[in-house]
UniProtKB/Swiss-Prot annotation:
One Gene Ontology cellular component annotation held by this UniProt entry: small ribosomal subunit
Function: Binds directly to 16S ribosomal RNA.
Signal peptide: none
Annotated region described as Disordered, given as residue ranges: 1-21
Sequence ranges of Basic residues compositional bias: 1-15
Transmembrane region(s): none
Annotated keywords: Ribonucleoprotein, Ribosomal protein, RNA-binding, rRNA-binding
InterPro entries documented for this protein: Ribosomal_bS20, Ribosomal_bS20_sf
Family: Belongs to the bacterial ribosomal protein bS20 family.
Single GO molecular function: structural constituent of ribosome
Gene: rpsT
Protein name: Small ribosomal subunit protein bS20
GO biological process: translation
Organism: Chlamydia abortus (strain DSM 27085 / S26/3) (Chlamydophila abortus)
Length: 98
């Protein structure tokens, strides 16, 4: 392993601000990707519940879709209007089956 860079006082060498932002944005990108994946998985489970036709699973699936989509908006992963579209379409599908 390469020796660690240190300052004159012996502490770790500080990074430039731009480097910190790059690292932070990479971390956030991974977190956002995993949350998007989770949201898509919940929507697929809801679609499977619709195909099965079980009313209780449809209702609980719809609640999960609402919850995950609202959290995505709060985190800034989805835009408000896209979330509204997703929820509206899910509700229409659920009402058609119930």
């Amino acid at each position: 392993m390469a020796p660690k860079k240190t300052t004159k006082k012996g502490g770790p060498k500080k990074r430039p601000s731009a480097e910190k932002r790059i690292i932070t944005s990479q971390k956030r990108c991974l977190i956002n990707q995993s949350f998007k994946s989770k949201a898509k998985t919940m929507m697929k489970k809801f679609e499977a519940a619709l195909k099965a036709g079980d009313q209780t699973s449809i209702a609980s699936g719809l609640q999960l879709v609402y919850s995950v989509v609202d959290k995505a908006v709060k985190r800034g992963i989805l835009k408000h209007n896209k979330a509204a579209r997703i929820k509206s379409r899910a509700t229409l599908r659920a009402n058609a089956k119930i």
